[in-house]
Each structure stands twice: as C-alpha cells, then as structure tokens.
Amino acid sequence: MLTYDRWETVEKPSFPSDNETKGALDVLAWAYREYGDEIVYACSFGIEGIVLIDLISQVKPDAEIVFLDTGLHFQETYDTIAKVKETYPSLRIIMKQPHLTLEEQAAQFGDELWKRDPNKCCELRKVIPLREVLTGVTAWISGLRREQSPTRRHVEYVNKDDKFRSIKVCPLIHWTWKDVWNYVYKHSLPYNVLHDRGYPSIGCAPCTAPALDPNDLRSGRWAGQGKTECGLHLT
C-alpha cells in the first residue's frame, strides 16, 4: 500500500487522462481499492465537490464524506448538503466541528477573529479538525484542479501531503471550469445556488465574496487579506 511513510519505496500509479472523466474515475477506483475505508473525502460542497461526490458514488456508494463545519458557512451551503443527502442516501456525510464554539473562540481570541487573523481562524476551525479526521486514515481525497489558481498548477493525481503526513488524492486535476459545469448540467446534479450569483469558490461567509477577477476563480476568497488558501493545502 502506498502510504506517507512508504512514499519513496512504493511505485506510484499512473492513470489515463484522455478518457471521458479525464482520469477521475480511474483514480477513484484505484484509491478505494488501495485504501478501502482508510480514505475519506474532505468536501466543501462547492461545484467540484458535487462532481466528485457523484463520481465517488459510482465507485463506493457508502463512502465517507467529511464536511468541515466551521459554523460560519452560508445557509446556501447547508441547503446544498441537505440536497446531496437526499440524492445520495448511502453516503456517510460527517459534519466535523471545531472544538471551540464561535462564542468560546470570541472569548479566547476576541470577536471576529477572521478579520484580524484569518490564518488563526482557519487553523482553529478547519486545519485542526481535518488533522483529527486524517489521524485515523491513510489517505484523503480533494477536489483540487490545476486551473483553479496559480498555487495549484502543479498538483498531481496522487500527492505526498507533508502537512498532514498523508496521501492526498486529487482526481480532478485536469478538469477545466467548463468540464465541471458540463458534467453538472449533463447529470442534473444539485449544486450551491451561490455559484449562480458570482461565487465560483465558496468558503465561510465572512471570508467569501463574488470573484474579483474572472480569470482567478478564488479571487473572492479573503479579499484584501493577502491570503489565497485556508491552510489545508500547502502551496
């Protein structure tokens, strides 16, 4: 089995990228054969997440999907999760919450920490909870695409994740924004209505705005903060 500690000694898999799903289904089939229940999908329920959930359901209908429930998400995001649960009732969707409630965080670090120190807020409400989830598994799945931002252009299908000492599987690396939406429309998948309101990338409500640059899908995240990632993905 390919693990973080055996990264240098185990042969890495290769996948075709010229088929209908640009390798995504092949990658997922390999991942669930390789890891079984030792792999989870950390999903934000953005549009890439919806595509991945549909693909995963074809490979492992009872897969474990983890949502980092920071307590700061848009209501539209929670509505999307409810629709996904109705569409894929066999999936095991886990709402992973941080140790601190928003009130406890405010008491300890001050009100609206996301405005003063967004990195600390992301660490408390996303990074630490994900680390706890990944402690019990060998690998995780992510919806990263190379087209999403300059910081993601070199992502591979299978990656050594030094931050979480895990294997990170990214089936959608070759998908374009157009590919994603074509798949959603073709299969009539439920999705977050905020995408129709100018939000190509959706995170916590206080730190997400409509895209500022049409050529940078993540330009609406942490606008004015000099920040482009929540800390889950090394750049």
Curated annotation (Swiss-Prot):
EC number in record: 1.8.4.10
Q: Does the keyword Cytoplasm apply?
A: yes
Q: Which source organism? A: Geobacillus thermodenitrificans (strain NG80-2)
Q: Where in the cell is it found?
A: Cytoplasm
A GO CC term? cytoplasm
Q: Name one GO biological process term.
A: hydrogen sulfide biosynthetic process
Q: Which reaction does it catalyse?
A: [thioredoxin]-disulfide + sulfite + AMP + 2 H(+) = adenosine 5'-phosphosulfate + [thioredoxin]-dithiol
- Name the UniProt record assigns to this protein: Adenosine 5'-phosphosulfate reductase
What CDD domains does its record include?
PAPS_reductase
Q: Which gene encodes it?
A: cysH
Function of this protein? Catalyzes the formation of sulfite from adenosine 5'-phosphosulfate (APS) using thioredoxin as an electron donor.
Q: Which UniProt keywords apply?
A: Cytoplasm, Iron, Iron-sulfur, Metal-binding, Oxidoreductase
